[in-house]
């Protein structure tokens, strides 16, 4: 018997002071009828203040309906940052790609371009260390070896966005800073686990360039070391600072986590962050800008498509 869909509902006050709803769709693990394709984009970055030109790459997913000749159709772009120990190839495997295909094959979600990035400098080096601890050179500020400027937020804006969005049919008119800001309504950033930490960090540093955010299964470190203690005031200030500085810019944060056996510190932060005066909790983008969904999942990057099935029903609307 085929597994059935189910809705996981927590009323206000049960976990956080707001209700949470997560739609579990087992079809994400099915066989898609409509399939997209992946393309690799190679680029260089010089943003790390070390005098070096680092070669890097990302993987771009083009949905089944993407037509390079149709220049009139402009696609929204969702960036994905993987978790600790992983790499940008995580969803390019046969099984991984199927789960991405199934998000859009459902017919319930507007197809978008997806970009799979990495904060690691070179995923082909020190592979065993990366896959074991994840502690290899990286630009997101979470490399234990130190000595690297935490400038991945610059790499995304200065190098990745133009490399991807000027190649495909997107809302980016040219590579200027003004054009990147002007097209923010068509751009989102998301990530799982350490990639969620990176998503909060992108919101903090690149708010003028991204309208939508989908952090999955991890809290913000508020710019502090991963294992440091942080107060609710520090967390709230870190997240809301760019929003207050650019109060004219609309946004939506769709955060997700597993419960009760995933990243508990994220759920703890969600008990107070949505109460900040810059937020309106709910799923209606016309009047809300923050939502938190709780699945029953364990912790692994491969579950991200199930979270996208929820968040992409709200983001880009």
List the model feature ranges, each with a label:
Residues 1-317:
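Non-catalytic cap/lid and distal C-terminal segments of serine-dependent acyl enzymes
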């Amino acid at each position: 018997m085929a597994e059935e869909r189910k809705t996981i509902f927590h009323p206000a006050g049960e976990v956080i002071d707001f209700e949470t709803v997560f739609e579990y769709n087992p079809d994400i693990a099915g066989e898609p009828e409509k399939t997209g394709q992946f393309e690799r984009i190679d680029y260089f970055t010089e943003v790390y203040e070390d005098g070096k030109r680092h070669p890097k790459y990302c993987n771009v997913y083009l949905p089944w309906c993407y037509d390079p000749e149709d220049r009139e159709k402009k696609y929204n772009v969702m960036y994905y940052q993987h978790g600790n120990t992983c790499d940008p190839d995580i969803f390019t495997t046969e099984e991984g790609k199927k789960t991405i295909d199934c998000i859009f094959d459902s017919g319930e979600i507007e197809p978008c371009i997806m970009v799979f990035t990495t904060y690691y400098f070179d995923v082909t080096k020190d592979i065993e260390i990366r896959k074991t601890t994840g502690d290899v050179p990286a630009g997101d500020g979470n490399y234990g070896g130190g000595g690297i400027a935490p400038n991945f937020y610059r790499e995304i804006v200065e190098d990745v966005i133009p490399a991807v969005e000027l190649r495909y049919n997107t809302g980016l008119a040219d590579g200027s800073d003004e054009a990147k800001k002007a097209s923010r309504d068509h751009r989102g950033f998301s990530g799982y686990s350490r990639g969620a930490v990176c998503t909060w960090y992108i919101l903090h540093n690149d708010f003028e360039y991204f309208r939508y955010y989908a952090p999955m299964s991890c809290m913000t470190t508020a710019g502090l070391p991963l294992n440091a203690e942080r107060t609710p005031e520090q967390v709230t200030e870190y997240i809301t600072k760019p929003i207050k500085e650019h109060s004219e810019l609309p946004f939506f944060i769709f955060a997700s986590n597993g419960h009760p056996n995933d990243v508990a510190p994220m759920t703890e932060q969600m008990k107070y962050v949505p109460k900040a005066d810059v937020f309106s909790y709910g799923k209606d983008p016309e009047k809300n800008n923050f939502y938190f969904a709780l699945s029953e999942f364990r912790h692994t990057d491969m579950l991200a498509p199930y979270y996208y099935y929820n968040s992409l029903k709200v983001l880009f609307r």
